[in-house]
Amino acid sequence: MEIPLQEQESSLKSSNEPSSSTSEPVVNTQGLDNQGEEILSQLYRPLKACDNTCYCKKCCYHCQLCFLKKGLGICYDRSRRRSAKRAKTTAPSAPDK
């Protein structure tokens, strides 16, 4: 029950050649790469202004900007400088002698 030499060589050649089933996942990973790039581009694009002032759960999560401002409390606006607190001038009740 020996296999002829030609059949052995042909079976070796077919195992060395890339099969069509291995090329299909490459196409799928390219699709995943494109999807990943699309998600990243959405993350880095500037956020659009939203004038919604409601703080209910539905409004806090309806867009990314509202989630950052209302849900997490993060605001990147320019912070105003606080004015120095004025010291209260009190008259000395007992003069030092």
UniProtKB/Swiss-Prot annotation:
Cellular localisation: Host nucleus, Host nucleolus
Compositional bias (Low complexity): 14-29
Region feature (Core): 67-77
Matches recorded under Gene3D superfamilies: Tat domain (4.10.20.10)
Residue segments, region Disordered: 1-32
A molecular function (GO) term: RNA binding
Start and end residues of each stretch annotated as Cysteine-rich: 50-66
Biological process (GO), any one: positive regulation of viral transcription
A Pfam family annotated for this UniProt entry: Tat
Motif Nuclear localization signal, and RNA-binding (TAR) location, chain numbering: 78-88
InterPro entries: IV_Tat, Tat_dom_sf
Keyword Transcription regulation: yes
Protein modification: The phosphorylation by CDK9 does not seem to be important for transactivation function.
Transmembrane feature ranges: none
Gene Ontology cellular component terms for the protein in this record: host cell nucleolus
Similarity remark: Belongs to the lentiviruses Tat family.
Domain notes for this protein: The Arg-rich RNA-binding region binds the TAR RNA. This region also mediates the nuclear localization.
Quaternary structure and partners: Interacts with host CCNT1. Associates with the P-TEFb complex composed at least of Tat, P-TEFb (CDK9 and CCNT1), TAR RNA, RNA Pol II. Interacts with CCNT2; the resulting complex is unable to bind to TAR RNA.
Protein name as it appears in the record: Protein Tat
